[in-house]
Amino acid sequence: MTDDASKAWSWSGVAMTAAGELAAFAQMACAFPLRRLGAHTLSDVDDHPVPVVLVHGILGDPTNFFVLRRHLARHGIRRFSSFAYRPRLDYQRISRDLESHIAHVLTSTDAGQVDVIGHSLGGLVGRYFVQTTGKHFVRRLVTLGTPYLALHNPAQELAVFGSDDALVPPPYDRAPRRMRVIEGCGHLGLLTDGRALDTIVRYLRPPMWAANRAADVAA
């Protein structure tokens, strides 16, 4: 490939990522007026009985997960609770508020555990909760574009990154034990990209054969 062709290919990739980010931003902007609708959906009728707690990023809000929620609902995951917080960087303090929120969700649903999905700083909040007081209350943790600051992440965490995320690049030099990188995806795109959403579904809902094997082992 010539230098000119290589540069053209590189700029093409940048343009596609930028378009994806703009599309993600547009979808979130359109969902913003709906922020008071469906923030908490804890129906007892669900193929996936584990409640899913959604934690947005520092400048986000619960509507950021609008596309993700619709995608999960199509795959039988319909019990959601959105955790919102005021913008600040003290994720340890936010984690204490998340602990209270999850305790309320568990009490309201009679569930023993929750799944947590956090975007950006929201992933840090969820991870800190699991690593401190919430290990036994969180079945699975999904972090999207979350800074990786430790040598080890929780055993139940799936860390998802965008290859073209300028804010939180994938930590290839110290990769988490369970990491997925979505090619050509940026920071906001992790909330809307179909490949990222499918990755989350597969992690929260293992294949039927895996569930049957787990049941056989438990028996």
Give the role of each language-model region:
Residues T2-I117, L121-A219:
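Lipid deacylating catalytic domains
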